[in-house]
């Protein structure tokens, strides 16, 4: 397969992934499409064509698996403790983790004497 065919395929994957990720949000969908189009028309000169294609495929994969949009449900809808209610756009391709990495991070923080990431105190994670 030629480089131009692979690039076109990656671009199409990106557009499909954006359509899934931003379903119902025309503003974000149009912004994502514009950004992808700009990247195809004026590619980063520091990257090879193969790297650019790989980057577009990675972006498409990230949009499909890791991006979940939330939409606030009516202003008057709240939980019993007064918090707002949101509806999440979780679809068949959304990657649902098991939170083991979050649990491991808390253990690591304790092992480091409570020092948070980036040298912070970790106070935000204690709440």
UniProtKB/Swiss-Prot annotation:
One of its GO terms (cellular component) is mitochondrial matrix. The keyword Metal-binding does not apply. The keyword Chaperone applies. Residues 1-15 form a transit peptide. It is found in: Mitochondrion matrix. It comes from the Eukaryota. InterPro entries: Complex1_LYR_LYRM7, MZM1/LYRM7. One of its GO terms (biological process) is mitochondrial respiratory chain complex III assembly. Keywords: Chaperone, Mitochondrion, Transit peptide. Coiled coil: none annotated. GO terms for molecular function: protein folding chaperone. Interacts with RIP1. PANTHER family: COMPLEX III ASSEMBLY FACTOR LYRM7 (PTHR46749:SF1). Assembly factor required for Rieske Fe-S protein RIP1 incorporation into the cytochrome b-c1 (CIII) complex. Functions as a chaperone, binding to this subunit within the mitochondrial matrix and stabilizing it prior to its translocation and insertion into the late CIII dimeric intermediate within the mitochondrial inner membrane. Modulates the mitochondrial matrix zinc pool. Belongs to the complex I LYR family. MZM1 subfamily. This is Mitochondrial zinc maintenance protein 1, mitochondrial. It comes from Vanderwaltozyma polyspora (strain ATCC 22028 / DSM 70294 / BCRC 21397 / CBS 2163 / NBRC 10782 / NRRL Y-8283 / UCD 57-17).
């Amino acid at each position: 397969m030629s480089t131009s065919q692979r690039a076109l395929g990656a671009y199409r994957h990106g557009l499909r992934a954006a359509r899934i990720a931003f379903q119902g949000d025309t503003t974000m969908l149009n912004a994502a499409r514009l950004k992808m189009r700009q990247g195809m028309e004026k590619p980063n000169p520091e990257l090879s064509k193969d790297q650019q294609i790989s980057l577009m495929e990675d972006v498409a994969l990230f949009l499909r698996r890791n991006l979940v949009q939330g939409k606030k449900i009516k202003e008057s809808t709240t939980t019993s403790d007064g918090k707002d209610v949101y509806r999440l756009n979780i679809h068949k391709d959304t990657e649902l983790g098991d939170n083991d990495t979050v649990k491991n991070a808390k253990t690591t923080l304790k092992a480091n004497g409570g020092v948070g990431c980036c040298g912070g105190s970790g106070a935000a994670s204690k709440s």
